[in-house]
Amino acid sequence: PKVSPRWPPIPP
């Protein structure tokens, strides 16, 4: 399965 990146990205 294709994993979608988180958007907006969460800062560390």
Swiss-Prot record:
Please give the residue positions where the record annotates the modification N6-methyllysine: K2
Cystine pairs: none
Per the record, the major location class is secreted
* Tissue/organ expression: Expressed by the venom gland.
Keyword set for this entry? Methylation, Secreted, Toxin
Outline what the protein does.
Answer: Toxin. Induces vasodilation in mice and rabbits.
Q: What is this protein called?
A: 1370.6 Da venom vasodilator peptide
State the species of origin: Bothrops moojeni
Q: What is the lineage of its organism?
A: Eukaryota, Metazoa, Chordata, Craniata, Vertebrata
